[in-house]
């Protein structure tokens, strides 16, 4: 079956790392092992958000390609449960475990999923955090890399599986293709941790959704001009 006949879902996650000072001493030593300068130590401490062993998923955004309906599941610091809509997008708060359960429940409705850099970040992160939370993964988010019938990772596709000298951010790809970057509204992925500390949970959720809207537009270019 050709992929344009398949129901597609685009998804993206946002994560926040643990407080470095709360790690046990062995874990601290592990992260600081190769950090020699103060700058390198700060960088190592800030890297906790990149690893499923030391971070939580605080937001998962999902966007149906065909209908433009969106679902954003997000943590709100354990506050009162929230549910609201903005246009075609439903925002639902919950714990990390509830976020992941909602993700897997929604994912079963689609045959193909689209990410940007999902193979090296979002997909393994979701699978491992699900296991850590005692949630059985119901689908392999890491299928064979060199086929895109099930998973289209646009970072892989647009660099022709790392044939280019380097990878580029979603922001730079958006600029190249004339797509509105999710960063244009004053927030970047590097600010997620600070926004979370400031209890700006809904701002993070909206930022995540801007990411997947941009990913959808980029996917349309790839599908029309580069897909074989």
Regions found by a protein language model. Name each.
Residues 2-7, 55-58, 63-68, 73-87, ...:
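Metal-dependent phosphoesterase core characteristic of DEDDh/y 3'-5' exonuclease domains
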Residues 26-27, 99, 192, 203:
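A general marker of short, structured functional hotspots
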Residues 2-98, 105:
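Conserved RNase H-like, two-metal-ion catalytic cores of nucleic-acid enzymes
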């Amino acid at each position: 079956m050709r992929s344009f006949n398949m129901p597609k879902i685009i998804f993206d996650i946002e994560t926040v790392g643990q407080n470095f000072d709360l790690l046990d001493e062995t874990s601290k030593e592990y992260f600081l092992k190769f950090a020699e300068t103060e700058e390198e130590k700060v960088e190592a401490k800030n890297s906790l958000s990149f690893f499923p062993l030391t971070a939580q998923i605080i937001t998962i955004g999902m966007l149906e390609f065909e209908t433009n309906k969106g679902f954003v599941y997000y943590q709100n610091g354990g506050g009162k449960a929230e549910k609201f809509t903005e246009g075609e997008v439903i925002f639902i708060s919950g714990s990390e475990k509830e976020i992941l359960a909602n993700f897997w429940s929604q994912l079963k409705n689609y045959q193909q999923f689209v990410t940007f850099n999902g193979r090296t970040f979002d997909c393994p992160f979701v699978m491992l955090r699900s296991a850590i939370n005692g949630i059985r993964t119901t689908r392999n988010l890491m299928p064979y890399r060199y086929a895109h019938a099930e998973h289209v990772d646009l970072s892989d596709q647009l660099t022709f599986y790392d044939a280019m000298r380097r990878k580029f951010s979603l922001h730079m790809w958006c600029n190249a293709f004339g797509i509105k970057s999710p960063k244009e509204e004053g927030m970047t992925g590097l600010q997620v941790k600070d926004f979370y500390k400031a209890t700006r949970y809904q701002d993070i959720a909206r930022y995540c959704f801007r990411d997947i809207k941009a990913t959808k537009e980029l996917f349309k270019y790839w599908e029309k001009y580069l897909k074989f």
